[in-house]
Amino acid sequence: MMIKLIATPSNALVDEPVSIRATGLPPSQIVTIKATVKDENDNVFQSQAFYKTNEAGEVDLEKTPALGGDYVGVHPMGLFFSLKPKKAFHRLMKKDVMNSPFCICLDLYDSVNWLETVRIPSKASQRVQRWFVGPGVKREQIQEGRVRGALFLPPGKGPFPGIIDLFGVIGGLVEFRASLLASHGFAVLALAYFAYKDLPEKLQEVDLEYFEEAANFLLSHPKIQQPGIGVISTSKGAEIGLAMACYLKQVIATVCINGATTTTAVPLRYQDLVVTPIQQALERMEVHVSGAVCFRHTTQYLQNKNILPVEKAQGKILFIVGENDELLDSKLHAQRAMDRLRRHGRSSGRMLAYPGAGHLIEPPYSPLCFASWQPVLGRPMCFGGDLMAHAAAQEHSWREIQKFFRKHLLQSGSKL
């Protein structure tokens, strides 16, 4: 019988699960399945797991437990979320979402194949294309007034619920989450706010009027549903997203993923208001055994007076926190914000805390990025996360994020 490696679907969105099966092998055979992908800079990411075939000579990743490798146990998508960079401290992140997918090569070997120095030919291979954009989604480059970014629109006439997508100190324009959400029926503006085109090269301050201009632009678009928009935000972006929720009436639903609930590093300005950043206790910074810097404890001693005025938020706020976040004690920050809401008699906040999850909680099946190189620091920064717990958090939170936006952005009678 011919040995086969079957992966279905072989062409799908990155948040869709893939079924992987090996057939035509001898019974009780130890096999290796490897996954390999290159990013747009030719950095290689790889994972592997060792399995034992059943009496029919088959391995089904939905049923067969991995005996060893990058994970152990039954994890149908383990080869995807356990991908690791061959060169340390690289992060797998799609830049050109419209024109190409990540192409993941799956290879099957009929032995334990783990030595890089020994080349063994694979018995079967399969390619899987993982897209960040679905059929019919359109991308519009945005350069309106001061606003710089990319707007992703789902197929159809609309109007669609509108969302602004913000990332952190990575800067530039990050589009992969916006394009993926647009593939699920949301109109999403991936918004740059520094280190992009004619925007400031460095983040010297957060000018909230820039983000208000972006919110007004989005609401003025003919395909955007009224009366308000959502914000999805991560890290420094989540700090800005929370400030938008507090001060901008246009924002009615905000998702803050592992962000500070204070102003950090640089001041925040809005009209006549200036919010100075809290001081970080840099002497509490720790260095991980890998050499990556952990900032988790540098903002632990924040005072309640430093918390952004969440009670002023006119919309709903969803805090998503990883309890193993090594960049920020994000659970403490979110708890302080929730406490402030309660003291003001507000029930507009909700917190989802994930034990074992790290800082970079991304769409399902994204590889855990425990640490990555930060040019600004000249060394790697630690994000934390336990592989299995982090993967579970990404799956669950992605569903909850979409449910949250559907509930609070859609008018009664609308369908999505």
UniProtKB/Swiss-Prot annotation:
PANTHER family: ACYL-COENZYME A AMINO ACID N-ACYLTRANSFERASE 1-RELATED (PTHR10824:SF1), ACYL-COENZYME A THIOESTERASE-RELATED (PTHR10824). This is Acyl-coenzyme A amino acid N-acyltransferase 1. It is an enzyme of class 2 (transferase). The gene is Acnat1. Expressed mainly in liver and kidney with low levels in adrenal and little or no expression in other tissues. It catalyses: tetracosanoyl-CoA + taurine = N-tetracosanoyl-taurine + CoA + H(+); eicosanoyl-CoA + taurine = N-eicosanoyl-taurine + CoA + H(+); taurine + octadecanoyl-CoA = N-octadecanoyl-taurine + CoA + H(+); taurine + hexadecanoyl-CoA = N-hexadecanoyl-taurine + CoA + H(+). The active site is at 235 (charge relay system), 325 (charge relay system), 359 (charge relay system). The keyword Phosphoprotein applies. GO terms for biological process: acyl-CoA metabolic process; fatty acid metabolic process. The lineage of its organism: Eukaryota, Metazoa, Chordata, Craniata, Vertebrata. One of its GO terms (molecular function) is N-acyltransferase activity. The modification Phosphoserine is found at residues 125, 414. It comes from the Eukaryota. It comes from Mus musculus (Mouse). Keywords: Acyltransferase, Fatty acid metabolism, Lipid metabolism, Peroxisome, Phosphoprotein, Transferase. Acyltransferase which efficiently conjugates very long-chain and long-chain fatty acids to taurine. Shows no conjugation activity in the presence of glycine.
